[in-house]
Structure formats: structure tokens, C-alpha cells
């Protein structure tokens, strides 16, 4: 193999490895974002549930929940 072909081959290998690493990092970032989204969604539900409980408490104490 000529030196030019060898260098081109090695450059192709390096580019392929870099692309694979970037794909792995993107997958990890997607997984982290999905996990954060699920956590935020659960936190939002908890806040909503707590607020609803607070409203019901006030209604009970003020006699509006009849």
C-alpha cells in the first residue's frame, strides 16, 4: 500500500472512531435528558397533588366542601 493510501485509510479509521464516540455521547445525552424530563414530570405531579390537597383542606376548614 502506498504511503498516501495508508494515510487516507488511517484518516478514515480515525474519522469513523470519532463519529462512533460522538454517537455514544449523543445517546448518553438523550438518555440523561429523558431521565431529567421524567423527573421533572414527576415533580410537577407531586406539586399538583400537594396543591390539590391544600385546596381541599381549605375548603374543608371553611365549610366550602359540602
UniProtKB/Swiss-Prot annotation:
Transmembrane segments: none annotated. It comes from the Eukaryota. GO terms for cellular component: cytosol. This is Stress-induced protein KIN1. The keyword Cytoplasm does not apply. Residues 32-45 have a biased composition (Low complexity). Induction: By cold stress, abscisic acid (ABA) and water stress. Residues 17-31 have a biased composition (Basic and acidic residues). Sequence repeats lie at residues 31-35, 49-53. Keywords: Repeat, Stress response. One of its GO terms (biological process) is response to cold. Residues 1-13 have a biased composition (Polar residues). The keyword Zinc-finger does not apply. Residues 1-52 are annotated as: Disordered.
